[in-house]
């Protein structure tokens, strides 16, 4: 059995004090980090190791969490064809909503035009500022990305912490365990027993989340300053509002159609959302999200396949950002893109968003990869948004996280691998008597 999250078990003598909840501590740490970074920027920049150390601690356990969840989930399947069905349905969902996110970003950019009137001469931009990102973008390709999913060695996949490589091996190992039947029971029992201490370790590491969030936020504000936000407030505001509308309207409609409330889901994963907000890293929340989705009634086999894959292929926030930022650069530099140019941009973004997935700074590097193929928009124009990308990355990561949580529940429901009563209890949507109370409606 997977260990409960930090605040899942209430004190036997009564409810725990509000300040003992992880999400309250992380929220307070974020606020403290903002204040320290603003008033003492030099000290704030020196606290970067706190955030980096916490993210490394979490990444340390991501590989074993994925392996144990996927391998034991698939090993327990009676029908191995279901593995292919789950993966196929997940990829169909990812493709549909990733494309929709790209289109929404493009439409919003054309309607709001956040870069209009800036009149920046492209020749005045310094291409050296974004040279590193452009070089990394050129190193990425669809073929290279797909072949890189196969690890050179099993140990190498775990040592590097490559999510897709670990997932690839875990799926194959789980299938092998299922095929050997009784001969593999001892291995399955061992892996199931190992799951509890691994997730207990995750819970222990999460106690350091407030420290990591404090250090990361103090560094961000200390280095970039609140002033950098004000300079490009139109773009930042447009992106944040668009992402919010995407979550509450688009994903909200998907959630409602599938029998649950997006607001209740956000409340349920609030700790993971605040963790992402504080660290700007969606990977920091991956173990906790997998744990909570299983506790919400999604079968382990679905959780293990959908969430790690979604971290590379279901990047709704990143996709909104890509088309919105690309058109912002064009508008700011006075470049008028025809609808043909914009469709080309959309098609290239659909491919490059997959080829650059799973790498550090994926959003910015993916944008560089897209612009390098579309000659109308100068790659050097990315220098305009380099200073605010850190603030944009938080919104990208938050939207990506919510998108993957919704995707997991939807795919589980499609496969009849969702315990709707358990989901209702997890989201707080049922009374003690078990009757629906608004958080979850019966699925049609």
Curated annotation (Swiss-Prot):
The chain crosses the membrane at residues 17-37, 57-77, 92-112, 139-159, 161-181, 201-221, 234-254, 320-340, 368-388. Its main location: membrane. InterPro entries: C4_dicarb_transport, Na-dicarboxylate_symporter, Na-dicarboxylate_symporter_CS, Na:dicarbo_symporter_sf. It is found in: Cell inner membrane. GO terms for molecular function: fumarate transmembrane transporter activity; malate:proton symporter activity; succinate transmembrane transporter activity. It is a multi-pass membrane protein. Keywords: Cell inner membrane, Cell membrane, Membrane, Symport, Transmembrane, Transmembrane helix, Transport. GO terms for cellular component: plasma membrane. One of its GO terms (biological process) is L-aspartate transmembrane transport. Disulfide bonds: none annotated. It comes from the Bacteria. Responsible for the transport of dicarboxylates such as succinate, fumarate, and malate from the periplasm across the membrane. Belongs to the dicarboxylate/amino acid:cation symporter (DAACS) (TC 2.A.23) family. NCBIfam families: PRK01663.1, PRK13027.1. This is C4-dicarboxylate transport protein. It comes from Rhizobium etli (strain CIAT 652). The lineage of its organism: Bacteria, Pseudomonadati, Pseudomonadota, Alphaproteobacteria, Hyphomicrobiales.
């Amino acid at each position: 059995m997977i260990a409960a999250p930090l605040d899942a078990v209430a004190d036997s003598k009564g409810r725990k004090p509000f300040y003992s909840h992880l999400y309250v501590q992380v929220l307070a740490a974020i606020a403290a980090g903002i204040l320290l970074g603003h008033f003492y920027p030099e000290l704030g920049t020196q606290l970067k190791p706190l955030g980096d150390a916490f993210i490394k601690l979490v990444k340390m356990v991501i590989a074993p969490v994925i392996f144990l969840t996927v391998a034991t989930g698939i090993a327990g399947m009676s029908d191995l064809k279901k593995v292919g069905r789950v993966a196929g349905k997940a990829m169909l969902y990812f493709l549909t909503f990733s494309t929709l996110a790209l289109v929404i970003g493009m439409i919003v950019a054309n309607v709001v035009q956040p870069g209009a009137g800036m009149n920046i001469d492209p020749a005045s931009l310094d291409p050296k500022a974004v040279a590193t990102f452009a070089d990394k973008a050129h190193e990425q390709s669809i073929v290279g990305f797909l072949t890189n999913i196969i690890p050179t060695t099993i140990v190498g996949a775990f040592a590097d912490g490559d999510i897709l490589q670990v997932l690839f091996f875990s799926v194959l190992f789980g299938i092998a365990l299922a095929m050997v039947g009784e001969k593999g029971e001892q291995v399955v029992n061992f892996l199931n027993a190992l799951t509890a201490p691994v997730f207990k370790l995750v819970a222990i590491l999460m106690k350091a989340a407030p420290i990591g969030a404090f250090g990361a936020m103090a560094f961000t504000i200390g280095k970039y300053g609140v002033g950098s936000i004000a300079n490009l407030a139109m773009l930042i505001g447009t992106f944040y509002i668009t992402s919010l509308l995407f979550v509450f309207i688009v994903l909200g409609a998907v959630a409602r159609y599938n029998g649950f409330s997006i607001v209740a889901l956000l409340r349920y994963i609030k700790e993971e959302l605040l963790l992402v907000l504080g660290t700007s890293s969606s990977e920091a929340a991956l173990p906790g999200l997998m744990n909570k989705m299983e506790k919400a009634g999604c079968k382990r086999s679905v959780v293990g396949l959908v969430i790690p894959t979604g971290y590379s292929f279901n990047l709704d926030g990143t996709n909104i950002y890509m088309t919105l930022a690309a058109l912002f650069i064009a508008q700011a530099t006075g470049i008028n893109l025809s609808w043909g140019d914009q469709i080309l941009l959309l098609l290239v973004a659909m491919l490059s968003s997959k080829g650059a997935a799973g790498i550090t700074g994926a959003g910015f590097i993916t944008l560089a990869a897209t612009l390098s193929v579309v000659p109308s928009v100068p790659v050097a124009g990315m220098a305009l948004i380099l200073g605010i990308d850190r603030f944009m990355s938080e919104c990208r990561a938050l939207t990506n996280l919510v998108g993957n949580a919704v995707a997991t529940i939807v795919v589980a429901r499609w496969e009849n691998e969702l315990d709707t009563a358990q989901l209702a209890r997890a989201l707080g949507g049922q009374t003690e008597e078990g009757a629906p109370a608004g958080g979850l409606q019966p699925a049609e």
